Curated annotation (Swiss-Prot):
This is Sec-independent protein translocase protein TatA. Its main location: membrane. The keyword Coiled coil does not apply. Residues 62-76 have a biased composition (Polar residues). One of its GO terms (molecular function) is protein transmembrane transporter activity. Keywords: Cell inner membrane, Cell membrane, Membrane, Protein transport, Translocation, Transmembrane, Transmembrane helix, Transport. GO terms for biological process: protein transport by the Tat complex. Residues 46-57, 77-88 have a biased composition (Basic and acidic residues). One of its GO terms (cellular component) is TAT protein transport complex. It is found in: Cell inner membrane.
């Protein structure tokens, strides 16, 4: 009574097909599908960027520790020849 029946929906769909034609409706559906696919790709690439930034933020800390541990080894190597010269 107050709702839309299946017959009313079919009549509206028939009128839309007659007005726009099947080719235009098919291209409209393809455009809409492409837009949804593009939106999903953009959302997933945004998540990938965040994960990549988090991974890059953790890497410099490890690199800085590696450089610091390498410096004392070089200084110890340089001091040994000097101590040998003083003893001779």
């Amino acid at each position: 009574m107050g709702g839309i029946s299946i017959w009313q929906l079919l009549i509206i769909a028939l009128i839309v097909v007659l007005l726009f034609g099947t080719k235009k409706l098919r291209s409209l559906g393809g455009d809409l599908g492409g837009a949804v696919k593009g939106f999903k790709n953009a959302m997933s690439s945004e998540e990938d960027k965040k994960a990549l930034e988090d991974a890059e933020a953790a890497k410099p800390v490890q690199t800085a520790q590696t450089v610091q541990s390498a410096q004392p080894t070089q200084q110890a190597t340089e001091k040994k020849p000097e101590s040998n010269k003083e003893q001779a």
